C-alpha cells in the first residue's frame, strides 16, 4: 500500500538488532493524508489518484506542522532510507510505496518493505538533469540555477549532436540532418565566431559514432525506438526528457568520450532516474544505455581502453533506490530553503571547472562554500533583496509544479472546464514533414474557449498526458481543427497546457545577473541609494502635447532611468516611437522590449509610422510570435553564421519580449538604453532581464492597470515600475491627455484611478459618439442606450461564475447595436470569468470579441459591454482587483454598457460610485 502524509515532528534514528544483524531505522511521525490508510487495491501499489488529498498535501503551513500530533502515526523507514529520513523536517510531505501496516500497542503503524520507495516532497518535481548536477556537487546544481546555460561552443555542438541523433532515429540521412541542423543554429554559431563548416565537422565526428552503432542493430522492428520522450512522475516527483527510449529502456547520449568499460556514474544516475519514471508507467527496465559519441572517433593508436560508444549497465534495485534518495535531497533542500555548501558531497574542488564561479558567488552572497569565498559580500540590503526574491521565484516554481499535479489530480472534464485542456479531439492524421518532424491534425468536438493560442507549446497526448503517449507540440492552427507540429507522430486525442518552468528559470538568472553582475550605478538606483539624474535638453520633441514632450525629454536625457506613466489611450506607444526616434538620431543602440509580443509589435509599428528605417531594426522572436505584417523585421536565425550575426549586431534597434531578453542569444548583446513597455505588468526580476542589457533604462506602463502575472502571492506582485514611480516621482511623467474615450466615458476612471488628472486630448476626442461612425445613428437606438455610458440592471441568477440572464441580455444588446448600424467587429464584451465568457460566446455571433479583461488590455473598441456576474453581497471585488475594472471601463471609444445586478454592485463603494456615474 502507499502511505502519504505530512511530517509532524522530529525524526528518531535508532539501531536495532534483528535476525539479519544490526539495522538502522528512522521513526517518522506523520499525519496521514486522507484516504491513505485504506488498503490499496491497485496491482502495482502506486496509483492512488485521490483528488481529496490535494488540500491536505499540497500546502505546507507552519500551523499544520505545529498542530499537536494526536492523529500522527509512526512511519518507520528501514536501512538506507534512513538517509532520506535525515533530510526530513516537520511540514514536509512524505510518500512510502509498498508500505506494510502493523498494529503495535493498539496503534496502526507503517514501515518500509524491501519493495518500498520513499519519496520526500513528491509534489516538487525535480528535473532529472538537476540530479545529475547534484551528484557531482550540490553546489553545482545551485550555481546552474543561478547562472543558466551560457552560450558556448560545447553547449551548441552538444545540442546539435542531440538533434542529429533524434533525426537518425527518425530515419533521416546523416548529411542532410547535419546540414539542416547547422543551418538552423547559424546565429548562435556566428555569435561564437564559428564557421558552419568547422561546426559540421565536429558534429559529424560525434554523429558518426552514433550512426555506426545504430547500423549494428539497425532500427529493426523489435528495436522499437523513439527519440526524446517527456517523462513525468507523479509518485517519484520527477520530470525530464529522455534522449531516447529503446525497447522501453532509456538511452542517454553524451557528447564526449569515455574509455572505461562502465558508463560514468553521473550518467548512470540520469538513466536510472528515467528508468524509475518508466517503471512507474508500467515498464520493467533491467538495463540502461549510455552512448558516448566521441569514442569511435578517437585514433585507435593513441588511446587505449574500451572504444565502444554504447555502454550498457544493469539497472539494479540498489541504484534505483540510491538515485531516488538523491532526488529526495534536492526536494528537501528546496523545501527547507537552505543553500548547499558543497560539503555534502566528496567532490574535489581542485578539479572543478566551476570553482572560480563558485567562490565568487559564495563571496558575493556571503554563503558558506567548500571551495571558499572570494570578493566582498554585497551590502545587507542587497543580500536581503536577493534572498526574498529567490524565495519568491521558488514559490512561483512550486505553482508551476502544482500545475503539473493537476494533470493527474483533475479529470479530463475538469481540465476542459478550467481551460487547461481540449479533451475531445478526434485524431485525423499524422503527416511527416521535411526534416522528420510531424504535422498532427485532429478535429475538435466542441468549440471550448481554452486559453490556447496559435504558437503555444502544448502537451499533445493520446488521451493520457502522463503515462500515455505524450509529446511537446506547437499549435500551428486552431479553428475547428487543431494542427500541431511535433517530433513524434502522437495520435493526438487531447492537448494540455504545458506548465513550463522556463520563465521561473530565467527570473532567477535575471536576479542573479542584476545583483552580481549589475552595474553599480544601476544598483544605486534599484536600491534607492541615489536619485536618477537627467541631462537637461532644450529641444521640443512633441509640439501638441506637453506631457508627452516632457516624457520624451526625460527618456532621452535620462542618465539612469526615466519612468513614463501612461493611462489608457494617452499615447504611450506614440511617445515610445518619438523617444526611440530621438535616440536613433543620437546614434544610440536601443533595446525595445515589453511583456507581450503584441506590445513589442505595436511599438514597432509605431516606429515604422514615425518613419524609422526598417533596416535599422531586428525583431528577435519566433515566427508565430511576431505579427505577420512585421515578419520582414524578424531576425532570421538560419543561414550563414556571419551574415546572421551581422544582422543582429548591426541593428541599432533590437526588439524582443522580456522573456526573450533572458535567452542565450540576447544575453550576449549590449545596449545604450533599454525601453520597456507594459512595465507595470512585469515582476521586478522580469524587468531586470531587459535592463541588465543596457546602460540606462526607460520604463513605460500604468500601475493602475493589470499587475504582473504571477501565481504566488509574494514580492513578485509589485512591479519594479510601481516601486520606482513611488520612490522617484521626479524621474516620472504622467501622460495626461487621452486620445480614446468620449468625455463621459473617461470621467469615472479619471476620478477614481487618476486623481481626476486624465483629460481628453482634443475636443474631437471629448465629443466622439457612435454618430461619427459610417451608417450608425444613435437615434436608431432605444432612448436608454443613447448616452455614451449606460447601465442595464439584471438581477443575478445566483451562480458564482456565470450568469445566464446577463448573457441573454448581452445577446439582445448586440442585436440592438447591429440594428442601429454598428459592425459586429466593433463591439467587445468583457466578462470576469472564463465560464461567463463561454456562456456569452454561445449566444452571440462569432465576430463579436468576448473575453476576459486580461485579453483586452492594450486594445480598444468602439463599443464595450461589461458583464459583471455579481450577485448577493459581493464577497470580494468581482474583477478581483480594481485595476481590472479600470482596464475594462477604459476600452471603449464611443459607448460603454454595464450589465449587472444593481443591488449586488451597490454593496461595494467603488461599484456604487460607478453605478452613480453610469446612471447620471
Ligand atoms: N501627440 C499626439 N498627437 C496626435 N496624435 C496622437 C498623439 N499621441 C497619441 N496620438 C494618437 O492617439 C492614439 C492613441 O495613442 P497610442 O496608441 O500611442 O496610445 P497608448 O497609450 O499606447 O494606448 P494603450 O493605452 O492602448 O496602450 C493613436 O492613434 C495615436 O496616433
Where would I find each of the regions flagged by the language model?
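OB-fold and OB-like beta-barrel modules that bind single-stranded nucleic acids
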Residues: 2-13, 87-103, 108-115, 456-462
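Nuclease catalytic cores
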Residues: 124-175, 179, 203, 375-390
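OB-fold (S1/OB) nucleic-acid-binding surfaces
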Residues: 13-79
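Conserved helicase motor core of SF1/SF2 NTP-dependent helicases
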Residues: 586-588, 594-601, 610, 644-645, ...
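Pre-ATPase regulatory/linker segments immediately N-terminal to the P-loop/RecA-like helicase/translocase core
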Residues: 296-317, 321-329, 454-550, 620, ...
Amino acid at each position: 500500500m502507499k502511505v502519504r502524509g505530512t511530517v509532524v515532528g522530529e525524526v528518531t534514528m535508532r539501531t536495532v538488532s534483528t535476525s539479519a544483524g544490526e539495522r538502522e531505522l528512522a521513526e517518522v511521525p506523520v499525519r496521514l493524508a486522507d484516504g491513505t490508510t485504506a488498503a490499496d487495491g491497485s496491482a502495482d501499489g502506486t496509483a492512488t489518484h485521490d483528488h481529496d488529498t490535494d488540500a491536505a498535501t499540497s500546502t505546507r503551513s507552519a500551523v499544520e506542522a505545529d498542530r499537536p500530533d494526536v492523529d500522527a502515526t509512526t512511519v518507520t523507514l528501514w536501512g538506507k532510507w534512513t538517509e532520506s529520513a535525515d533530510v526530513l523536517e516537520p511540514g514536509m510531505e512524505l510518500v512510502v510505496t509498498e508500505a506494510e501496516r502493523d498494529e503495535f500497542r493498539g496503534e496502526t503503524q507503517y514501515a518500509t518493505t524491501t519493495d518500498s520507495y520513499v519519496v520526500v516532497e513528491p509534489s516538487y518535481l525535480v528535473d532529472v538533469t538537476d540530479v545529475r548536477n547534484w551528484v557531482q556537487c550540490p553546489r553545482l546544481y545551485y550555481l546552474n540555477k543561478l547562472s543558466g546555460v551560457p552560450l558556448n561552443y560545447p553547449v551548441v555542438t552538444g545540442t546539435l549532436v542531440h538533434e542529429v541523433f533524434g533525426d537518425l532515429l527518425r530515419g533521416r540521412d546523416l548529411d542532410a540532418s547535419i546540414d539542416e541542423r547547422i543551418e538552423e543554429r547559424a546565429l548562435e554559431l556566428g555569435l561564437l565566431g564559428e564557421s558552419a563548416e568547422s561546426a559540421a565537422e565536429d558534429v559529424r565526428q560525434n554523429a558518426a559514432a552514433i550512426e555506426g552503432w545504430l547500423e549494428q542493430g539497425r532500427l529493426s522492428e523489435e528495436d522499437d525506438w523513439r527519440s526524446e520522450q517527456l517523462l513525468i512522475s507523479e509518485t517519484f516527483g520527477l520530470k525530464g526528457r529522455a534522449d531516447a527510449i529503446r525497447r522501453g529502456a532509456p538511452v542517454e547520449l553524451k557528447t564526449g568520450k569515455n574509455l572505461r568499460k562502465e558508463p560514468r556514474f553521473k550518467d548512470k544516475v540520469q538513466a536510472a532516474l528515467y528508468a524509475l519514471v518508466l517503471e512507474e508507467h508500467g515498464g520493467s527496465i533491467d538495463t540502461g544505455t549510455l552512448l558516448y559519441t566521441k569514442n569511435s572517433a578517437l585514433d585507435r593508436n593513441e588511446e587505449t581502453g574500451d572504444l565502444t560508444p554504447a555502454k550498457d549497465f544493469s539497472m539494479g534495485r540498489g541504484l534505483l533506490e540510491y538515485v531516488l534518495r538523491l532526488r529526495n535531497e534536492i526536494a528537501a533542500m528546496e523545501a527547507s530553503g537552505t543553500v548547499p555548501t558543497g560539503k555534502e558531497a566528496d567532490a574535489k574542488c581542485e578539479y572543478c571547472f566551476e570553482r572560480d564561479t563558485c567562490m565568487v558567488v559564495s563571496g558575493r552572497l556571503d554563503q558558506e562554500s567548500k571551495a571558499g569565498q572570494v570578493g566582498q559580500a554585497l551590502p545587507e540590503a542587497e543580500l536581503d533583496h536577493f534572498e526574498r526574491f529567490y524565495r519568491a521565484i521558488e514559490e512561483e516554481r512550486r505553482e508551476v509544479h502544482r500545475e503539473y499535479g493537476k494533470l493527474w489530480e483533475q479529470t479530463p472534464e475538469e481540465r476542459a472546464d478550467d481551460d487547461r485542456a481540449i479533451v475531445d479531439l478526434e485524431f485525423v492524421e499524422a503527416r511527416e514533414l521535411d526534416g522528420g518532424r510531424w504535422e498532427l491534425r485532429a478535429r475538435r468536438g466542441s468549440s471550448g474557449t481554452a486559453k490556447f493560442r496559435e504558437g503555444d507549446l502544448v502537451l499533445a497526448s493520446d488521451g493520457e498526458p502522463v503515462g500515455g503517449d505524450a509529446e511537446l507540440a506547437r499549435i500551428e492552427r486552431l479553428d475547428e481543427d487543431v494542427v500541431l507540429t511535433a517530433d513524434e507522430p502522437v495520435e493526438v486525442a487531447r492537448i494540455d497546457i504545458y506548465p513550463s518552468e522556463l520563465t521561473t528559470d530565467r527570473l532567477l538568472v535575471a536576479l542573479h545577473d542584476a545583483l552580481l553582475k549589475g552595474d553599480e550605478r544601476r544598483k544605486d538606483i534599484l536600491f534607492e541609494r541615489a536619485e536618477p539624474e537627467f541631462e537637461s535638453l532644450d529641444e521640443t520633441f512633441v509640439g501638441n502635447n506637453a506631457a508627452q514632450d516632457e516624457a520624451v525629454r526625460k527618456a532621452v536625457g535620462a542618465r539612469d532611468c526615466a519612468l513614463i506613466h501612461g493611462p489608457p489611450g494617452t499615447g504611450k506607444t506614440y511617445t515610445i516611437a518619438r523617444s526611440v526616434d530621438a535616440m536613433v538620431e543620437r546614434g544610440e543602440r536601443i533595446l525595445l522590449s515589453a511583456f507581450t509580443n503584441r506590445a513589442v509589435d505595436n511599438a514597432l509599428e509605431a516606429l515604422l509610422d514615425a518613419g524609422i528605417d526598417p533596416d535599422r531594426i531586428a525583431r528577435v522572436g519566433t515566427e508565430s510570435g511576431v505579427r505577420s505584417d512585421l515578419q520582414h523585421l524578424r531576425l532570421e536565425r538560419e543561414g550563414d553564421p556571419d551574415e546572421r550575426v551581422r544582422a543582429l549586431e548591426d541593428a541599432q534597434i533590437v526588439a524582443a519580449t522580456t522573456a526573450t531578453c533572458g535567452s542565450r542569444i540576447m544575453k550576449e548583446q549590449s545596449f545604450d538604453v533599454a525601453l520597456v513597455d507594459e512595465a507595470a505588468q512585469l515582476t521586478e526580476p522580469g524587468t531586470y532581464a531587459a535592463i541588465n542589457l543596457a546602460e540606462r533604462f526607460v520604463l513605460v506602463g500604468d500601475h493602475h492597470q493589470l499587475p504582473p502575472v504571477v501565481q504566488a502571492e509574494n514580492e513578485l506582485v509589485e512591479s519594479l515600475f510601481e516601486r520606482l514611480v513611488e520612490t522617484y516621482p521626479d524621474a516620472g511623467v504622467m501622460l495626461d491627455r487621452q486620445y480614446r474615450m468620449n468625455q463621459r466615458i473617461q470621467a469615472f476612471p479619471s476620478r477614481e484611478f487618476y486623481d481626476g488628472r486624465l483629460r481628453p486630448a482634443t475636443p474631437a476626442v471629448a465629443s466622439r459618439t457612435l454618430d461619427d461612425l459610417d451608417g450608425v445613428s444613435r437615434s436608431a437606438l432605444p432612448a436608454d442606450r443613447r448616452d455614451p455610458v449606460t447601465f442595464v440592471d439584471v438581477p443575478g441568477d445566483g451562480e458564482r461564475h456565470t450568469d445566464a440572464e446577463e448573457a441573454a441580455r448581452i445577446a439582445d444588446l448586440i442585436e440592438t447595436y447591429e440594428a442601429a448600424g454598428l459592425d459586429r467587429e466593433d463591439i467587445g464584451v468583457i466578462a470576469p470569468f472564463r465560464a461567463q465568457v463561454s456562456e456569452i460566446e454561445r449566444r452571440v455571433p462569432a465576430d463579436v470579441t468576448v473575453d476576459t479583461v486580461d485579453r483586452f488590455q492594450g486594445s480598444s473598441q468602439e463599443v464595450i459591454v461589461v458583464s459583471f456576474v455579481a450577485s448577493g453581497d459581493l464577497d470580494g471585488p468581482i474583477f478581483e482587483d480594481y485595476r481590472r475594472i479600470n482596464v475594462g471601463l477604459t476600452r471603449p471609444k464611443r459607448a460603454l454598457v454595464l450589465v449587472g445586478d444593481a443591488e449586488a454592485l451597490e454593496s461595494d463603494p467603488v461599484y456604487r460610485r460607478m453605478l452613480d456615474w453610469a446612471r447620471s
